[in-house]
Curated annotation (Swiss-Prot):
This is Probable choline kinase 1. The gene is CK1. Pathway: Phospholipid metabolism; phosphatidylcholine biosynthesis; phosphocholine from choline: step 1/1. ATP binds at residues 73, 210, 227. GO terms for biological process: response to wounding. Belongs to the choline/ethanolamine kinase family. The lineage of its organism: Eukaryota, Viridiplantae, Streptophyta, Embryophyta, Tracheophyta. Its EC number is 2.7.1.32.
């Protein structure tokens, strides 16, 4: 079946009925979308913290036993403070063109329809399975090597400074003091000076490689990395650092905002991931290369804590998703100040 992508001026969605009408409108040319709204099932998907995500299921016109699924993504409030939606759409379409991730099926004013990938989204525990972690490491190396259009400049430091300005504009005087926002520009400057090197490898980074953005085909073990909203060119060590930090999170627990840093991977687990990452291309990898990237990734966790700490403050003011963004931010900044003496001054 040919799937057409089109842009629509459909108004915003605020209910399951709205989502069903979006599907009927954008899918009118597919030839298998039923007209009876009662036969369309809308299922909210948990774990998203930037957008609201739904799955729509329906029996197709080809028969009651033949079902289709699509994914509907409703853009979160205030996301334009974090990234340019037009650029994100271009990245999404480019990734689809390269055979990565889901296809874009249609757009409406505050969201889009995506192909539903028939694979299992990973759980927090999956990241700690050695074989699965190896698959992710190899896929991440492949991701970093993508030749994406546009400038290949590092975006990390510019983005941190932009987000800091937004956080300061939104924060109350009490929050300014609690999160030590006045001094963060100096911290960002220090990190950029200490972590930037001419010989560091720059790649197209996902920047949000938490378990919910990784899917696995349980037959072939093929890994699919999804959700490219924060993607940009950055030091690969930063992206690996982000992945390691995400091992402290479980966004499907009763307290999804709580981070458990006793779960942060030990040196042996991190070394294995990086060795697999570097060796996945088939080229010989030296111990020196592994140790250098291991050290760099650990140092870049500091930038990662500031990144997601600022994200938490901004989101706490603009996003209506049920998640304790401010407490999440507090934990990320706490880790920054705890780890900084060990990683920069030790």
């Amino acid at each position: 079946m040919a799937i057409k992508t089109k842009t629509s001026l459909i108004p915003s969605c605020s209910s399951p009925e709205d989502l069903k009408r979006v599907l009927q409108t954008l899918g009118s040319s597919w030839g298998d979308v039923v007209e009876d709204l009662e036969r369309l099932e809308v299922v909210p998907l948990k774990g998203a913290m930037t957008n609201e995500v739904y799955q729509i299921n329906w029996p197709t016109l080809n028969g009651e036993d033949v079902h289709r699924k699509v994914l509907v993504r409703i853009y979160g409030d205030g996301v334009d403070l974090f990234f340019n939606r037009g650029d994100e759409i271009k990245t999404f379409e480019c990734m689809s063109h390269h055979g990565y991730g889901p296809k874009l099926l249609g757009r409406f004013s505050d969201g889009r329809l995506e192909e539903f990938i028939h694979a299992r989204t990973l759980s927090a525990d999956d990241l700690r399975v050695a074989e699965t972690s190896d698959f992710i490491a190899a896929k991440l190396r492949e991701f970093h090597k993508l030749d994406m259009p546009g400038p290949k400049n590092v975006l990390l430091w510019e983005r941190l400074r932009t987000w800091l300005k937004e956080a300061k504009n939104l924060a109350s005087p009490i929050e300014m003091d609690k999160y030590r926002l006045e001094g963060l520009e100096n911290e960002i400057n220090l990190l950029e000076e200490r972590l930037t090197r001419d010989d560091q490898e720059i790649g197209f980074c996902h920047n949000d490689l938490q378990y919910g953005n990784v899917m696995i085909d349980e037959v072939t073990n093929a890994i699919t990395i999804i959700d490219y909203e924060y993607s940009s060119f950055n030091p690969i060590a930063y992206d690996i650092a982000n992945h390691f930090c995400e091992m402290a999170a479980n966004y499907h627990s009763d307290t999804p905002h709580v981070l458990d840093y006793t779960l942060y991977p030990g040196e042996g687990e991190r070394r294995r991931f990086i060795s697999t990452y570097l060796g996945s291309t088939g080229n010989a990898t030296s111990d020196k290369e592994v140790e250098r990237l291991l050290k760099d990734a650990e140092s870049y966790t500091l930038a990662n804590h500031i990144f997601w700490g600022l994200w938490g403050i901004i989101s706490g003011h603009v996003n209506k998703i049920e998640f304790d963004y401010m407490e999440y931010a507090r934990q990320r900044f706490e880790q920054y100040w705890l780890r900084k003496p060990l990683l920069l001054e030790g």
